[in-house]
Every structure is written in C-alpha cells, then in structure tokens.
C-alpha cells in the first residue's frame, strides 16, 4: 500500500481506500445507476473485507479489500478512464480516485464521493441452503453480467458455479479468480 494511505475509518473521518481492479470493475457492473435509493448508487466497503454492490434485483459480494474499517463505507466511483490498471485508490477528502498499474504508476484519474446512507444488510439476501428445481427463469441481461464478471475474474477459464434455491428464491453464482479473489452474485428469478 502506498505511503500515507490511511485506511481506518471513523464517522466523519476522511480516508483513502484501496481496491483491486477485479473488485472495482465487478462492483461497478452490479451497482444501481441513478436509483432513488441513493445508497445503492455506490460500492459498499465492509469491515470484514468484503465489497458489495446491488441494484435491488441482483447483488455482488466479493472479497477481499485490504482496508481496515469500523463500519460500512459507501463510495460512489466514476467509470475508469482506462482498463489497464491493477488497483485504484479512492480519496474521499479530495473526491479523486486514482488508477495505478502493477508498478504503482498512476495511469488515470476519476471522481469519487462518500455516500452518507445505510447499505442494505447484504447477508440477508444470500440463500442459506440450496433446493432442487426443474425450471427457473432469469432475466437474460442479468446472466450476461454474470458472464462478464466471470470473464473479468478469469479470462482463460470462465466458470460459474450456480447454487439454486428453488424456482422462487434467489440463485447464487460463485466466481473465483486465480489470484484468490472470489465473488458471489445473487440473482432473483423471474416468474414464468
């Protein structure tokens, strides 16, 4: 982590958050865009090292960020100007996000801001058990985003492990990267 990068957070305290490209790009895919529930328009950094994003119909929970937090922190991040970066530093004081390559050279910049709100309890939407089903319907656009996330996490071997929980409850898509990052995508089924 670069020098002077404060990653602890108390109420009202300004900080810098570090996030890998995989986690940031994945979260940006699943966060809400211009939702009236303003707290969904950002990425939630959780104290246990997970990152979460949701638009209300699907959610992504991924791990692991390196920041030391006491509470959830929700940050809105602009789209990256480049895809050639290894990690991003989000500075909530200046409102600037900087993108760095694997040699810690800055390769781009954007804007970010902390969102003052309460992120939904993401653990409540993760099904605790699986159940067999003969038929289940999904919005194809949501499944296309699961495929994009799998390609982002592992371009050479795009694999997704689905856990079904009947045809009326959310399904979980498990994705992992060779670098150790993992993600769960919760997708609500459609009525058929």
Where are these regions (language model features)?
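DNA polymerase processivity clamps
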Residues: 6-192
């Amino acid at each position: 982590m670069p020098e002077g990068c404060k990653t602890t957070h108390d109420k009202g305290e300004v900080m810098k958050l570090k996030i890998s490209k995989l986690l940031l790009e994945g979260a940006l895919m699943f966060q809400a865009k211009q939702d009236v529930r303003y707290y969904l328009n950002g990425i939630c950094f959780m104290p246990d090292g997970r990152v979460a994003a949701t638009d209300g119909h699907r959610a992504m929970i991924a791990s692991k960020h390196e920041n030391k937090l006491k509470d959830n922190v929700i940050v809105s991040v602009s789209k990256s100007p480049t895809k050639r970066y290894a990690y991003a530093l989000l500075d909530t004081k200046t409102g600037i996000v900087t993108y760095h390559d694997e040699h810690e050279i800055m390769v781009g910049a954007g804007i970010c801001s902390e969102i003052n709100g309460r992120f939904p309890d993401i653990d409540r939407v993760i099904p605790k058990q699986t159940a067999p089903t003969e038929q289940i319907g999904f919005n194809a656009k949501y499944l296309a985003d699961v495929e994009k996330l799998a390609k982002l996490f592992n371009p050479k071997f795009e694999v997704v492990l689905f856990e079904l929980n009947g045809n009326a409850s959310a399904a979980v898509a498990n994705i992992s990267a060779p670098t150790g990052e993992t993600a769960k995508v919760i997708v609500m089924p459609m009525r058929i």
